[in-house]
């Protein structure tokens, strides 16, 4: 079947199981081919082909609400709802989003990108349905990895308490991104081997009903027997005790089993949890045999071999540079303990985990716990190294403030993917951390201009014993600069003048340093002399350099690959105001007040006006203003 001709999922209603099996093969072939060119979340989507088809056949989207947790497994859903013809633009600039998008389709009822949100959203929709008196089914689809998130467990508790009609589909592939961890994962493991839960439950209840109710004592005994047998025989008790009817485990690649259980779930009053077992990467051997999460999300690849088409780049990734520097330091510093919230591969911590298995903790999708775990370690003199993406640190804000910074604990936050990340789009852009961290007392924030300075900042963070410290670094590879053999501490709160100039000073850090230097070089040809300062410490700032600049009345331009509101430029403006420099000319460039969608980082920077050319244009608008005032 040509899946690009699909307009909506209604055609599934009249298809036979044999036809659906053929459709599954066509969809897998389509995904493998398209994603080999664009990259994307291939593993999760190959694993949910039959499940997604079954959901759209049994339910009536968009009337019935299919809510995809995390959303990276929504490609099959997009195909079945008429978007296959757009897959050449998947995750490309102005193209199809890699996640559910309400503006794309009426079938996308919930937007996401972070995990564990679907159940809370489903509960909200179910309450709204009941208040309005409508009858649609509410069906959140959540993975076993996302179910480890505290928010999901909070929602399970509320749904079970309120007894709302919600059908939760647990897509259990034993992996979220990397292999799942934790006690809840072990519970699911027991469930997988428990056989047909509902059959055992029904038989048990049938037998117990045949016990004659002669007197209260016998009835009480029968109830105790029932409870004991329930705990002994039925592993689904975890969900039953939360108030759910548990169905499964069900083969997520068997249409007959899926249809039988989905139709049965529709008849049950109250919340239902359907436990579906799927194989991540099914149908493509490199992805199917992946044990560590490499094929969760990828760039382009060769279909025949499974080899990734990596750009020619000999420089190490920023994640690798940071993790390997910490690993080297951990050989002599026994205080160092690494923590990751389910991102050991993305954060390049495999080497650390292999060398120091007793000092490496993957806590699962649990950013709040990871942060307070680090705080607890710090109270006992350890040096916790929390490797966390900027976008996911948002989920642990209270723990950063209340548990770490308020107690002034020595936690090292390694904030990965800081700045624009590109194809994953608005849910993953790491542009808010400066704004939500800068105003928190006791916290040091820094960002290097290159990987050599980066390794020295890692060393500085490990040696820093006066409170929490955060190192921001971007996604992707470094610049390929030579690394010093000996690590050194960088004095906290010191900046670095990279280029002298008399007409204007650019204050910037991180990825925008190279833009500023290039702009200054080109402006020099127009007789505009620009000073460039590496403002590597966002907090505390270098007050000496700031006073010198402000006293000289030189115009200042701040540049940051982060949101302007509450950002670094705002800090410079506050400093000038608070110290009485009310005539200072300070301009800011950065991320505007809107969410930045997907595309390459280069395309996005051009769209928001944050390139060398834009810097040159801005400087030329500032300098005449300065001359006119003179």
Swiss-Prot record:
Subunit structure: Homodimer.
Biological process according to GO: 1-deoxy-D-xylulose 5-phosphate biosynthetic process; isopentenyl diphosphate biosynthetic process, methylerythritol 4-phosphate pathway; terpenoid biosynthetic process; thiamine biosynthetic process
Residues where thiamine diphosphate binds: 72, 113-115, 145-146, 173, 284, 367
GO CC aspect terms: cytosol
Pfam families: DXP_synthase_N, Transket_pyr, Transketolase_C
UniProt function note: Catalyzes the acyloin condensation reaction between C atoms 2 and 3 of pyruvate and glyceraldehyde 3-phosphate to yield 1-deoxy-D-xylulose-5-phosphate (DXP).
Family from the record: Belongs to the transketolase family. DXPS subfamily.
Keyword NAD included in the entry's annotation: no
Molecular function GO labels: 1-deoxy-D-xylulose-5-phosphate synthase activity; magnesium ion binding; thiamine pyrophosphate binding
Note describing how the cofactor binds: Binds 1 Mg(2+) ion per subunit.
Record field: catalytic activity: D-glyceraldehyde 3-phosphate + pyruvate + H(+) = 1-deoxy-D-xylulose 5-phosphate + CO2
Taxonomic source organism: Geobacillus sp. (strain WCH70)
The enzyme's E.C. designation: 2.2.1.7
Pathway: Metabolic intermediate biosynthesis; 1-deoxy-D-xylulose 5-phosphate biosynthesis; 1-deoxy-D-xylulose 5-phosphate from D-glyceraldehyde 3-phosphate and pyruvate: step 1/1
Keywords in alphabetical order: Isoprene biosynthesis, Magnesium, Metal-binding, Thiamine biosynthesis, Thiamine pyrophosphate, Transferase
InterPro entries reported in the protein's UniProt record: Dxylulose-5-P_synthase (IPR005477), THDP-binding (IPR029061), Transketo_C/PFOR_II (IPR009014), Transketolase-like_Pyr-bd (IPR005475), Transketolase_BS (IPR020826), Transketolase_C (IPR033248), Transketolase_CS (IPR049557)
Family matches, as PANTHER family: 1-D-DEOXYXYLULOSE 5-PHOSPHATE SYNTHASE-RELATED, 1-DEOXY-D-XYLULOSE-5-PHOSPHATE SYNTHASE, CHLOROPLASTIC
SUPFAM superfamilies: Thiamin diphosphate-binding fold (THDP-binding), TK C-terminal domain-like
Gene3D superfamilies: 3.40.50.920, 3.40.50.970
Cross-referenced PROSITE patterns: TRANSKETOLASE_1 (PS00801), TRANSKETOLASE_2 (PS00802)
Record: residues binding Mg(2+): 144, 173
Descriptive protein name: 1-deoxy-D-xylulose-5-phosphate synthase
Cofactor(s) essential for the protein: Mg(2+); thiamine diphosphate
């Amino acid at each position: 079947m040509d899946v690009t001709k699909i307009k909506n999922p209604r055609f599934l209603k009249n298809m036979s199981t044999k036809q659906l099996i053929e459709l599954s093969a066509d969809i897998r072939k389509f995904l493998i081919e398209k994603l080999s060119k664009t990259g994307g979340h291939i593993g999760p989507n190959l694993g949910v082909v039959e499940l997604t088809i079954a959901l759209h056949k049994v339910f009536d989207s968009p009337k019935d609400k299919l809510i995809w947790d995390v959303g990276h497994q929504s490609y099959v859903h997009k195909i079945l709802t008429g978007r296959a013809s757009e897959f050449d633009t998947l995750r490309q600039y102005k193209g199809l989003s890699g996640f559910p998008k309400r503006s794309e389709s009426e079938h996308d009822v919930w937007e996401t990108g972070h995990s564990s949100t679907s159940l809370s959203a489903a509960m909200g929709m179910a309450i709204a349905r009941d208040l309005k008196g409508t009858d649609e089914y509410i069906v959140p689809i959540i993975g076993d990895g996302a179910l480890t998130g505290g928010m999901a467990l909070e929602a399970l508790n509320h749904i079970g308490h309120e007894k709302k009609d919600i059908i939760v589909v647990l897509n259990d592939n034993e992996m979220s991104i990397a292999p799942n961890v934790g006690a809840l994962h072990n519970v699911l493991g027991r469930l997988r081997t428990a056989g047909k839960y509902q059959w055992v439950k029904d038989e048990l209840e049938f037998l117990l009903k045949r016990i004659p109710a002669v007197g209260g004592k016998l009835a009480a005994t029968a109830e105790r027997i029932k409870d004991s047998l329930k705990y002994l025989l039925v592993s689904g008790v975890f969900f039953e005790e939360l108030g759910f009817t548990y169905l499964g485990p069900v083969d997520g690649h068997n249409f007959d089993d899926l249809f039988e259980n989905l139709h049965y779930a529709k008849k049950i009053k109250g919340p239902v949890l359907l436990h579906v077992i799927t194989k991540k990467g099914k149908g493509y051997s490199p992805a199917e045999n992946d044990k560590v999460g490499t094929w969760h999300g990828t760039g382009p690849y060769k279909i025949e071999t499974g080899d990734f088409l990596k750009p020619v780049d000999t420089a190490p990734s920023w994640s690798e540079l940071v993790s390997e520097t910490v690993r080297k330091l951990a050989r002599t510093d026994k205080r160092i303990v690494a923590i990751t919230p389910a991102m050991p591969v993305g954060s390049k911590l495999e080497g650390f985990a292999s060398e120091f298995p007793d000092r490496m903790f993957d806590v699962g999708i649990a950013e709040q716990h990871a942060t307070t775990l680090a705080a607890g370690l710090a109270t006992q003199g350890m040096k916790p190294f929390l490797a966390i993406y900027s976008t996911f640190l948002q989920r642990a804000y209270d723990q950063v403030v209340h548990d770490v910074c308020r107690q002034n604990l020595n936690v090292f936050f390694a904030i990965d993917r800081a700045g624009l990340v590109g194809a994953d789009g608005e849910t993953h852009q790491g542009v808010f951390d400066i704004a939500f961290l800068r105003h928190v007392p006791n916290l040091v924030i820094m960002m290097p201009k290159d990987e050599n300075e980066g390794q020295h900042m890692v060393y500085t963070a490990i040696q820093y014993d006066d409170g929490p410290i955060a190192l921001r670094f971007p996604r992707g590879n470094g610049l390929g600069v030579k690394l010093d053999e000996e690590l050194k501490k960088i004095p906290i709160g010191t900046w670095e003048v990279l280029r002298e100039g008399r007409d204007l000073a650019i204050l910037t850090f991180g990825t925008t340093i190279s833009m500023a230097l290039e702009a200054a070089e080109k402006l020099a040809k127009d007789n505009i002399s620009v000073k460039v300062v590496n403002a590597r410490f966002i907090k505390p700032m270098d007050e000496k350099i700031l006073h010198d600049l402000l006293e000289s009345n030189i115009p200042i331009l701040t540049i940051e690959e982060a949101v302007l509101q509450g950002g670094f430029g705002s800090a410079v403006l506050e400093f000038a105001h608070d110290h009485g420099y009310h005539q200072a000319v300070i301009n800011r460039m950065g991320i505007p007040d809107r969410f930045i969608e997907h595309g390459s980082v280069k395309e996005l920077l051009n769209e928001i006006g944050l390139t060398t050319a834009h810097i040159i244009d801005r400087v030329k608008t500032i300098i005449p203003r300065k001359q006119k005032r003179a």
